[in-house]
Design a protein with these regions (language model features):
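Alpha/propeptide regions of enzymes that mature by internal proteolysis
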Residues: 5-16, 21, 25, 31-34, ...
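Flexible, acidic active-site loops/lids enriched in D/E/S/T/G that coordinate Mg2+ and/or position polar
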Residues: 18-98
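General beta-strand structural signal in soluble alpha/beta enzymes
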Residues: 38-42, 71-73, 82-84, 103-104, ...
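Short acidic loop-to-helix transition motifs that present clustered carboxylates
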Residues: 44-47, 155, 174-181
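Short acidic, glycine/serine/threonine-rich loops at helix termini
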Residues: 50-52, 83-86, 104-107, 158-164, ...
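Short glycine/serine/threonine-rich phosphate/pyrophosphate-binding segments
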Residues: 75-84, 89-91, 157, 178-182, ...
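Oxyanion/phosphate-interacting regions
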Residues: 183-235
Length: 235
């Protein structure tokens, strides 16, 4: 997938780049010895031609002895960044035992992520200021030296305002909070905070766990219809 869309960097057409990644990832599964089920994918069956939620893939379709897994995929995260040759586009695949990945609906998720040192020290149950001061204390930094990555969206304005009142170094990103969370875990930043996409949140959780970091997510509904859909999916 990465090679396929990488050849289209700078092409100016994000849909073309995304389509190349999707087709390459889907084709690759034909030769992988698993029975995979898409938990997080390109959308509902009626909205995505392949890698749709619930699609079953892999050589395990014809061989019941092969392991059954759930997968969360984003064949090309930050499609526009690839199309215009900007940083932080990635191809993502998370694999877990069958039944262990959250089938997150198309809604928002409030997220917080950071390095392993912050285990049990940061939480969505705390206020933004409490998380900032806790992280600063554990990481032995002045609050003003903390770098916090936040998606630049209206829904995050109150968090951004609070951090700027504390003189935190706030890095606003236009897209790509999966990479943002990985940067926070790896030390290029100190925290990722804010509301983003729920399906990407599941992938982020898997990535952060693999990097031995800290992640917490909570579904966030800005409209009742999204909550109704989530309740239907998660029953």
């Amino acid at each position: 997938a990465a090679i396929a869309c990488g050849k289209l960097r700078g092409c100016g057409d994000k849909n073309k780049a995304d389509d190349a990644a999707v087709k390459a990832m889907r084709k690759a599964f034909d030769s992988i010895p698993v029975h995979a089920r898409v938990a997080i994918g390109e959308g509902e069956m009626d909205k995505a031609p392949m890698l749709y939620i619930g699609e079953e893939l892999g050589k395990g379709l014809l061989d019941s002895s092969l392991p059954q897994v759930d997968i969360a995929v984003d064949p090309l995260e930050c499609t526009s960044h690839c199309a215009f040759d900007l940083p932080n586009s990635i191809c993502v695949l998370a694999v877990a035992p069958r039944g262990t990945l959250l089938h997150a609906p198309e809604c928002y998720m409030d997220k917080i992520a950071g390095p392993s040192a912050l285990m049990n020290k940061i939480s969505l149950g705390l206020s933004v200021e409490e998380n900032i001061r806790s992280a600063a204390a554990i990481l032995k930094k002045p609050v003003q030296e903390l770098k916090v990555i936040v998606l630049d969206r209206p829904r995050n304005e109150s968090k951004i305002r609070t951090m700027r009142q504390l003189d935190v170094n706030v890095e606003l990103i236009q897209n790509g909070d999966i990479v943002g969370a990985m940067r926070a875990v790896n030390g290029d930043a100190d925290l990722l905070l804010g509301i983003g996409s729920a399906p990407e949140g599941v992938i982020t959780a898997a990535a952060v766990k693999g990097l031995n970091g800290v992640f917490e997510g909570k579904l966030y509904f800005h409209e009742q219809s999204y909550q109704d859909r989530a309740e239907e999916i998660l029953q």
